[in-house]
């Protein structure tokens, strides 16, 4: 009976994914039409009517695309997420209130932003550890003046979308540490970072703490090798913040959230496999910091 129910759910999801592709295509066509009309209005001496009509159609097209994807994401979440999460966590709570995970509570370096928001919170216990995951989005709001109308408008741009997890390790540490990607500018200007002695690790990551000697005892050679191994299978650049009270924050700049259908090209079985793989990556990182 359970298998029949699962098959029906996945058939419904497959139908929803097909609808999503059609909705996204319609939205793209509307968006392109809106751009063409707006550009034509500008070329024709700043025809305000055409510009406004073009912008309205463009906005409508973007809304259609967004709504279509949102519906498919929800369908995928309802059909797949409970099973995936239930195999990893116990005592699962969907949308716990208030959430434990707060991106502003960490010193993980993030892009400049105006607003930080979290969504899709899920809480459970992983091997007895309170654990919570969510999607974090950062947006930057700016104002600009349109030449063709002279009107000031606000522009809201998403500058970061990532998957985050918080796990309470039920133990204390003598200091804090933060690990984050070492980019080209860091290498060019030789930004200050704690050197671990592991050449591969030092090339790939920055490390900060308020006690260099102690943090190198926490970040043992075995832990560094395990982190490097996980870096090879990561779905994006990631950062880790371990606090003295044992709270471990893991942040992956993947460009999407947990249980996100992406471009809608995967069938339900492929989505299930990817969702499970992404969640397993996070729990593997928790394991790195468990024990001595």
What are these regions (language model features)?
Residues 1-24:
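Cytosolic juxtamembrane N-terminal segments of multi-pass membrane proteins
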Residues 2-9, 73-89:
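Juxtamembrane membrane-interface segments of multi-pass membrane proteins
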Residues 42-56:
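Hydrophobic alpha-helical transmembrane segments
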Residues 24-45:
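Canonical alpha-helical transmembrane segments of integral membrane proteins
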Residues 19-29, 111-113:
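Loop-to-transmembrane boundary segments
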Residues 82, 86-91, 96-140, 144, ...:
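Charged, low-complexity intrinsically disordered regions
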Residues 56-83:
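Transmembrane-cytosolic junction motif
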């Amino acid at each position: 009976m359970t298998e029949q129910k699962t098959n029906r759910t996945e058939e419904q999801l497959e139908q929803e994914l097909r609808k999503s592709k059609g909705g996204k295509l319609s939205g793209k066509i509307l968006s392109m039409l809106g751009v063409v009309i707006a550009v034509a209005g500008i070329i024709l001496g700043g025809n305000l009517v055409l510009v406004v009509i073009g912008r309205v159609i463009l906005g409508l097209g973007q809304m259609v695309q967004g709504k279509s994807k949102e519906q498919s994401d929800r369908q995928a979440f309802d059909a797949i997420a409970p099973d995936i999460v239930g195999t990893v966590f116990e005592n699962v709570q969907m949308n716990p209130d208030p959430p434990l995970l707060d991106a502003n509570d960490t010193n993980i370096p993030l892009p400049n932003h105006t607003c930080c928001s979290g969504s899709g919170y899920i809480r459970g216990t992983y091997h007895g550890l309170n654990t919570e995951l969510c999607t974090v989005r950062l947006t930057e709001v700016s104002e600009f003046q349109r030449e063709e109308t002279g009107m000031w408008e606000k522009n809201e741009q998403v500058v970061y979308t990532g998957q985050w997890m918080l796990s309470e390790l039920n133990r204390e540490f003598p200091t804090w540490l933060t690990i984050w990607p070492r980019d080209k500018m860091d290498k060019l200007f030789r930004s200050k970072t704690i050197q671990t002695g592991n050449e591969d690790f030092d090339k790939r990551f920055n490390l900060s703490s308020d006690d260099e000697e102690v943090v190198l005892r926490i970040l043992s050679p075995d832990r560094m090798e395990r982190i490097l191994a996980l870096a090879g299978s990561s779905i994006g650049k990631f950062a880790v913040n371990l606090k003295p009270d044992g709270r471990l924050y893991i942040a992956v700049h993947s460009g999407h959230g947990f249980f996100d259908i992406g471009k809608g090209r995967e069938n339900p079985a492929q989505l299930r496999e990817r969702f499970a793989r992404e969640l397993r990556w996070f729990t593997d990182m928790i394991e790195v910091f468990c024990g001595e």
